[in-house]
Amino acid sequence: MKQSYKKNKKRFVMLIGLLFLMISVMTVNDSALSSRLLPVLPDHLLVFPNDYGAHPDFRLEWWYITGWLETDDKKKFGFQVTFFRYATDLNFGNPSRFAAKDVVIAHLALSDPAVGRLMHREKTAREGFDLAYSKQGNTGVKLDDWFLVREENGTYQVDMRSEDFGLQLSLRPTQKPM
């Protein structure tokens, strides 16, 4: 069990490192995007529910949900669901549907504190062809068969399953947005 935990922990650290490296490399050449992407400013007024969705005028955004789950037999698990949308420096003016303008990255993690085990999976794809997207307006992000959607009543639907574990959740917020 410890070997599996160490292997998963190493993969998780490598994923986070790869994500930061990718963002660092992609931000080195900002000149192509500087005229179209907006800076993030502290006084930007948010208007909900429209601002729950994607903002293609900004470089990077993410939808992040964490929490604790309890089974019927009182076993507890921690979970994390994250979707990222990243505007690339590539093909902005290219009208082709094949042009990679945005990348969607998704990460799913489930922790079992009773045995010190962390399971996680990740996926990455460019937006397009209904395989990966981040919708403007209300939350709607998808990568392959994984998705996070906010319904009109405010409930979030999550479906992220892999070959060995996964989550299907219906979540109702109990607090206002931060």
Predicted features along the sequence, with ranges:
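Targeting-peptide/extracellular-domain and disordered-appendage signature
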Residues: 2-13, 22-178
